[in-house]
Amino acid sequence: MNRTNFIKLLGLGSVALHSFPSMAFNTRNTDTLELIGKGNPTVFGNGFSLRKEAYDAFVKMRAAAEKEGISIHVVSSYRNYAHQNRIWERKYKRFTKQGLSPIKAIEKIIAYSTIPGTSRHHWATDIDIIDKNTTYSGDVLVPRKFHGDGPFCKLREWLEANANTYGFYIVYTDRANRKGFKYEPWHYSYAPLSKPMLTEYRKLDIKKMLQAEKLMGSEHFNEKFINSYIKENILDINPELLS
């Protein structure tokens, strides 16, 4: 399968959101810091945090799922830079303590976790979700639990059939030859907001930002690694989320 056609630097006016409220993300009214998790976005939710339009759409989607016996529960939503950095440091310390080299530890981390400042969860448009109406134990964000006899298989099937109606799209698909983060059947993004935000994010000097941050292991972020991370981890996603 051919590689995803990566987004071009288009203006916000090129983003078509005809099926949704005209509340598309307006970067002129938003601090650039919000794109990298260092701002203070206005968020809504009880036990989770999303931007208003994404929150309203989620509430409608959750209500529709309830009618089918599915109780959508948000495991993760908005995460600021500090939160993402805690995740990064915890994993980096654990993997290097287990004997992995710094480079191998970083490679293992970015199978599922983002480098602080690059997470879609910084935007308050993305959610990790499960079904609370089932019996489960242990780690919940595991692909096999969303397939076959897994406790969240019914949720996955319902989302595949209905989530797009509410503006939510899976981010990291199981598409053949897709690179970057591994398949995450639990991670959905509210496209009417996240698409234009990604367009604006692309305009930032991501390479310069990553090289300037003093993260654990960041001395190994050479130009080749950063270019690959941007191309594969940030941009090789569901084409429906690309402008």
For the regions a language model picked out, list residue spans one by one:
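Extracytoplasmic cell-surface/polysaccharide-interacting catalytic and binding patches
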Residues: 1-243
